[in-house]
Regions:
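Short, Lys/Arg-enriched N-terminal segments with co-localized hydrophobic residues
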Residues: 9-22
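N-terminal beta1-alpha1 ligand-phosphate binding loop
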Residues: 23-44
Length: 172
């Protein structure tokens, strides 16, 4: 696995200086170093800005609806400030046994999520939203990936969590 760049301090939308039209044309609406790493592989100039949105799951919302809504809201939140730029928003979650799994945030929750996923089929749903400044339209694409986890024992899960620290990854 390629090592990630050191964590960057990504400004939130409220911490930004006034709009500068000489900046890049593409804005990544995300605080994720993983998404910045992926977009950086395309060797495009872009600016990364953390959107400030409520990421709570709405009642009755499916995993696919949830990630599509968040990707769209992230793109639109940043596009309000930068309406003349292409804005890319994205989100991902996993679903196991009908439960939406977000970022665990803590080691014990990461272990719990992976224990629940052991031997199960898990769907990772990734949504990408692109705001087009010419039309003010947001296009959203969804890619579900189905993974069948082999049975994992507790010590293997703990080793993985302690080594990889997947606390900011949906479903650990």
């Amino acid at each position: 696995m390629t090592p990630l760049r050191p964590a960057l301090k990504v400004p939130t939308i409220n911490q930004l200086p006034p709009k500068d039209t000489s900046m890049t044309e593409i804005v990544l609406a995300s605080s994720s170093p993983y998404r910045a790493e992926l977009l950086g592989r395309l060797q495009l100039d872009f600016e990364q800005i953390a959107p400030e949105i409520d990421e709570s799951i709405a009642p009755g919302e499916t995993a696919d609806q949830y990630v599509c809504r968040l990707a769209r809201e992230k793109a639109l939140a940043v596009a309000k400030r930068y309406p003349d730029r292409i804005v890319i928003g994205s989100d991902q979650c996993s679903e196991c046994r009908g439960q939406i799994l977000g970022k665990p945030g803590r080691i014990d929750r990461a272990i719990e999520q992976l224990t629940d996923a052991s031997g199960q089929r898990v769907t990772l749903s990734t949504a990408v939203a692109v705001y087009d400044p010419d039309t003010a339209h947001v296009e959203v694409a969804l890619v579900p990936t189905h993974v069948h986890f082999r049975r994992l024992n507790r010590s293997a899960i703990e080793r993985y969590v302690n080594l990889e620290k997947p606390l900011d990854c949906a479903g650990a």
